[in-house]
């Protein structure tokens, strides 16, 4: 997540006018989370309005009584344990005697019905009692209490939240990515995250923090509406106590665990603003694959987790998808950028490689340790210089790429371990290696190198005929040729055993140019024609419409003029999906764009090529207005969206938009699923 409008400082300034606005918005009804966020802007919530805000944030406002159909019988095998835990909890709350019995029945009923409806066995270790504490303080009726509890469990408590569970293996990888020294210290003591953070995650800090602090954390967390954000809050708690933890080298494992487990208890209300600001910063420095590859941990899903993906306990480090690697280094300004290190043998690298990748032959680690050490030194210097010079190959984040074949990547894993032992932060591995890169480029390739994707692969051996050796001299401008020349020189330099290898590599990086604007005349500004397709697009056998006329009338002048920061919009908490694409006009011209999907709308941001990192809001369409999504057999990546109204008399088309979307199948599937959710919500 990036800084900006998605999470503003938790300040108390601004008088009480915003509180009146919030109260009026809540009283008016029909208020959504985005409206609330715009009013609240990260400020502490008034206690009397918290219940209404949380219900909207949890999407249970106006929801019916889920317990209405239940007979109310408390007869689970573990009922005595449930009753005992609830009774102890009520005693801790110091509830007036006349209300205690009713509250006890509410809590016991909520837990019992949840267990019955979800076929879950209760145990004290689950932290459910603590999770209910901040909700009980809202003094909700039983039906709302259950709905809120269910929503929190469903959206914010990850699957397998148990000892040795997958969520904690993932947390260890996040710690290692940002704080390798701390991770190494805990690993040495054989302290795993589940041993101290089980109740952090299982209760969303309610187990250890005071009610006031817990409510303040939940105020921000529920408005953030990002279940993964809890990982960064947990990370900051560790980071803030890092020096104390590292000083406990002589303490026993049990003593360190006890200290770690209780650290959230020291939080007070004044700490919350800094906690969220720091979490936001670390969040912005984390690859998007951290979320995307583990999205199934949260929410309702019928999809199983593949065995080979599930064992994060065996992962060397955080994995990053090849699609993110390609997209990240096209970003301008803020955001995660990767310095890709290709660890395959020289002959494989020469046959074909990612054009921006630095070659580090992992075989050297055993065959020639001194040359390997020199190459590593050169690599780190080259990374530094590439960042300073603004090279498109530059990035703070080291991503190692192997072949994708386990037996061949053994040496690369040793290289990875070497960097991790040196406590190098921001170390990741490319998921699936070069094989996955080849497959991804094949999937998004439209019509060979001329489509604009061929420039991603470079070759230093002159071989041709497969995607691993796509012609490097595609017509992508002088800076692409310069990039390939740079990679070739780096490869030759790294093969040289001369002591001057470091200086050579650095000079090559320094002499590389940053991407330049390709507009050379006013005629170029209308976009690049989509090759191989006639100016008038027909999708399958669909009827044609005068889309230029529709396009020009489908948005206001104000919309067309609004300029936004692309990365800020992509990282908004309500953005569920982001698809880099090209908007295709009837003239055949294409414009680099981004499709962003929220719970209810789809936005098209068209890049402003003369203002890097900025875009116009080209269109904003309600998902429930999509009446048809079609593609062409010869060009399945070319997707047409038709918007309008459906009625008994037929479909009235009001707007048509066409996009060239890499991995179009994934994009349309995600959009269709979101449309169905909108329609289901409207029907209910």
Swiss-Prot record:
<protein>
    <recommendedName>
        <fullName>TBC1 domain family member 23</fullName>
    </recommendedName>
</protein>
<dbReference type="GO" id="GO:1990403">
    <property type="term" value="P:embryonic brain development"/>
</dbReference>
<feature type="modified residue" description="Phosphoserine">
    <location>
        <position position="474"/>
    </location>
</feature>
<keyword id="KW-0968">Cytoplasmic vesicle</keyword>
<dbReference type="GO" id="GO:0099041">
    <property type="term" value="P:vesicle tethering to Golgi"/>
</dbReference>
<feature type="modified residue" description="Phosphothreonine">
    <location>
        <position position="514"/>
    </location>
</feature>
<feature type="modified residue" description="Phosphoserine">
    <location>
        <position position="469"/>
    </location>
</feature>
<keyword id="KW-0333">Golgi apparatus</keyword>
<dbReference type="GO" id="GO:0032680">
    <property type="term" value="P:regulation of tumor necrosis factor production"/>
</dbReference>
<dbReference type="GO" id="GO:0050727">
    <property type="term" value="P:regulation of inflammatory response"/>
</dbReference>
<keyword id="KW-0217">Developmental protein</keyword>
<feature type="modified residue" description="Phosphoserine">
    <location>
        <position position="507"/>
    </location>
</feature>
<dbReference type="GO" id="GO:0042147">
    <property type="term" value="P:retrograde transport, endosome to Golgi"/>
</dbReference>
<dbReference type="InterPro" id="IPR000195">
    <property type="entry name" value="Rab-GAP-TBC_dom"/>
</dbReference>
<dbReference type="GO" id="GO:0031410">
    <property type="term" value="C:cytoplasmic vesicle"/>
</dbReference>
<dbReference type="GO" id="GO:0016192">
    <property type="term" value="P:vesicle-mediated transport"/>
</dbReference>
<feature type="region of interest" description="May mediate the interaction with FKBP15 and WASHC2; required for endosome to Golgi trafficking">
    <location>
        <begin position="559"/>
        <end position="684"/>
    </location>
</feature>
<dbReference type="InterPro" id="IPR001763">
    <property type="entry name" value="Rhodanese-like_dom"/>
</dbReference>
<dbReference type="InterPro" id="IPR045799">
    <property type="entry name" value="TBC1D23_C"/>
</dbReference>
<comment type="function">
    <text>Putative Rab GTPase-activating protein which plays a role in vesicular trafficking. Involved in endosome-to-Golgi trafficking. Acts as a bridging protein by binding simultaneously to golgins, including GOLGA1 and GOLGA4, located at the trans-Golgi, and to the WASH complex, located on endosome-derived vesicles. Together with WDR11 complex facilitates the golgin-mediated capture of vesicles generated using AP-1. Plays a role in brain development, including in cortical neuron positioning.</text>
</comment>
<feature type="modified residue" description="Phosphoserine">
    <location>
        <position position="300"/>
    </location>
</feature>
<feature type="domain" description="Rhodanese">
    <location>
        <begin position="334"/>
        <end position="446"/>
    </location>
</feature>
<dbReference type="InterPro" id="IPR035969">
    <property type="entry name" value="Rab-GAP_TBC_sf"/>
</dbReference>
<dbReference type="InterPro" id="IPR039755">
    <property type="entry name" value="TBC1D23"/>
</dbReference>
<comment type="subunit">
    <text>Directly interacts with GOLGA1 and GOLGA4. Interacts with FAM91A1, C17ORF75 and WDR11; the interaction recruits TBC1D23 to AP-1-derived vesicles. Directly interacts with WASHC1 and WASHC2/FAM21. Interacts with FKBP15.</text>
</comment>
<feature type="region of interest" description="May mediate the interaction with WASHC1">
    <location>
        <begin position="514"/>
        <end position="684"/>
    </location>
</feature>
<feature type="region of interest" description="May mediate the interaction with C17orf75, FAM91A1 and WDR11">
    <location>
        <begin position="514"/>
        <end position="558"/>
    </location>
</feature>
<dbReference type="InterPro" id="IPR036873">
    <property type="entry name" value="Rhodanese-like_dom_sf"/>
</dbReference>
<dbReference type="Pfam" id="PF00566">
    <property type="entry name" value="RabGAP-TBC"/>
</dbReference>
<dbReference type="GO" id="GO:0005802">
    <property type="term" value="C:trans-Golgi network"/>
</dbReference>
<dbReference type="Pfam" id="PF00581">
    <property type="entry name" value="Rhodanese"/>
</dbReference>
<keyword id="KW-0597">Phosphoprotein</keyword>
<dbReference type="GO" id="GO:0007420">
    <property type="term" value="P:brain development"/>
</dbReference>
<dbReference type="GO" id="GO:0031175">
    <property type="term" value="P:neuron projection development"/>
</dbReference>
<feature type="modified residue" description="Phosphoserine">
    <location>
        <position position="556"/>
    </location>
</feature>
<feature type="domain" description="Rab-GAP TBC">
    <location>
        <begin position="44"/>
        <end position="225"/>
    </location>
</feature>
<dbReference type="GO" id="GO:0032755">
    <property type="term" value="P:positive regulation of interleukin-6 production"/>
</dbReference>
<dbReference type="GO" id="GO:0005829">
    <property type="term" value="C:cytosol"/>
</dbReference>
<dbReference type="Pfam" id="PF19430">
    <property type="entry name" value="TBC1D23_C"/>
</dbReference>
